[in-house]
Each structure stands twice: as structure tokens, then as C-alpha cells.
């Protein structure tokens, strides 16, 4: 191998060993599925002996819509209220790149949105 190739390989190894900070944000309207996904991520992090914080429970957003029950406007003026609750959790991890890739490749239940943000060092 030439010197250039050796330097490139060494640089790639250093990047893989470099510890990065990531924040995984989970969002869902279904609490059980959200808790299952967050517990799976935490278990994987504990198996790899990673520095973790969380899952941190963020305040639940409640979206409400009020509508009239009767479509034609006649009759008594009765109203119907609908609401949707949005639950959020986040988990902070510190780990090398390869281990983070393994942890984030878990199966995610339908209805759970996952956002992964990598902090710059």
C-alpha cells in the first residue's frame, strides 16, 4: 500500500473510534408503542455499555377541534370536541459511530416517528 492509502485507512479508523453525541427524539400518539421503542433503544445502549441519558418525557401536546354536531345548522346547537395527544421522548447517547449505527437499526413500530440528530464536536 502506498503512504496515501495508509493515511486514508488510518483516518477512517480514527473516525470510527471517535465518540459522537446523538439525540434520538421519538414522537407518537400511542404511548405503549412509544414506550416499547424507547425501552428497546435503552436496552441496546446498556448492552453496549454506552453513556446515555433518558428517556426524557417531554410535555404532551393536546390538539383540540370543536365542531357542530348537526351539518345543516338546524336544531339545538350542540358541539362535539375531538382531541389528539402527541407524546414525545428523547434519549441522549455518546458512542463511536459503528455502535450508534447498530443501535439505530432496531425495528420501529408503526406510528412512532424517530428523529436522530448528531451533535457536532
UniProtKB/Swiss-Prot annotation:
Its main location: cytoplasm. Disulfide bonds: none annotated. Component of the small ribosomal subunit (SSU). Mature yeast ribosomes consist of a small (40S) and a large (60S) subunit. The 40S small subunit contains 1 molecule of ribosomal RNA (18S rRNA) and 33 different proteins (encoded by 57 genes). The large 60S subunit contains 3 rRNA molecules (25S, 5.8S and 5S rRNA) and 46 different proteins (encoded by 81 genes). One of its GO terms (biological process) is cytoplasmic translation. Ubiquitinated at Lys-6 and Lys-8 by HEL2, to activate the ribosome quality control (RQC) pathway in response to stalled ribosomes. N-terminally acetylated by acetyltransferase NatA. Also partially acetylated by NatC. One of its GO terms (molecular function) is mRNA binding. SUPFAM superfamilies: Ribosomal protein S10. InterPro entries: Ribosomal_uS10 (IPR001848), Ribosomal_uS10_CS (IPR018268), Ribosomal_uS10_dom (IPR027486), Ribosomal_uS10_dom_sf (IPR036838), Ribosomal_uS10_euk/arc (IPR005729). Pfam families: Ribosomal_S10 (PF00338). The modification N-acetylserine is found at residue 2. One of its GO terms (cellular component) is cytoplasm. It is found in: Cytoplasm. Belongs to the universal ribosomal protein uS10 family. This is Small ribosomal subunit protein uS10. Keywords: Acetylation, Cytoplasm, Isopeptide bond, Ribonucleoprotein, Ribosomal protein, Ubl conjugation. There is a cross-link at residues 6, 8, 21, 32, 101 (Glycyl lysine isopeptide (Lys-Gly) (interchain with G-Cter in ubiquitin)). Component of the ribosome, a large ribonucleoprotein complex responsible for the synthesis of proteins in the cell. The small ribosomal subunit (SSU) binds messenger RNAs (mRNAs) and translates the encoded message by selecting cognate aminoacyl-transfer RNA (tRNA) molecules. The large subunit (LSU) contains the ribosomal catalytic site termed the peptidyl transferase center (PTC), which catalyzes the formation of peptide bonds, thereby polymerizing the amino acids delivered by tRNAs into a polypeptide chain.
Amino acid at each position: 500500500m502506498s503512504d496515501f492509502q495508509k493515511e486514508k485507512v488510518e483516518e477512517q479508523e480514527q473516525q470510527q473510534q471517535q465518540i459522537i453525541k446523538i439525540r434520538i427524539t421519538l414522537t407518537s400518539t400511542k404511548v405503549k408503542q412509544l414506550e416499547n421503542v424507547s425501552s428497546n433503544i435503552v436496552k441496546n445502549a446498556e448492552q453496549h455499555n454506552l453513556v446515555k441519558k433518558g428517556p426524557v418525557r417531554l410535555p404532551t401536546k393536546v390538539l383540540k377541534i370543536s365542531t357542530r354536531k348537526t351539518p345543516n345548522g338546524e336544531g339545538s346547537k350542540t358541539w362535539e370536541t375531538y382531541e389528539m395527544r402527541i407524546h414525545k421522548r428523547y434519549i441522549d447517547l455518546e458512542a463511536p459511530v459503528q455502535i450508534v449505527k447498530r443501535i439505530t437499526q432496531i425495528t420501529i413500530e408503526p406510528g412512532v416517528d424517530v428523529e436522530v440528530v448528531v451533535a457536532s464536536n
